[in-house]
Amino acid sequence: MNRFDVWLVMKNIEKGRVVDNIGLCAILSPDELNDLPNLIVAPMTREFEDLPSRIEFEFEKNKGFIMLDQLRSIEKNNFIKKMGELESKVQPQLCSCLQEFFAL
């Protein structure tokens, strides 16, 4: 499990607005934190919403959006199957958006 890997994940159910319980997520945790029991992920969707925290991507010839406004920490035992890796041109966009998102 590495940063920018795409996994099929059983997401934690939360109250309120919840993205589907099982779905694709991009790992955002730095690889240096791989020894921890949880990883920080961003869910992925095909539904467009005009938000600055949504990063457009293409994965397996399908377009979609990484939802940085839906970040969550997921236990490793909820990771079902590795599906691939985010394309390299999206990775710096993610990092830049996260830096802006969490700017103090």
Feature locations, PLM:
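Conserved functional hotspots at enzyme active or ligand-binding sites that engage polyanionic ligands
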Residues: 1-104
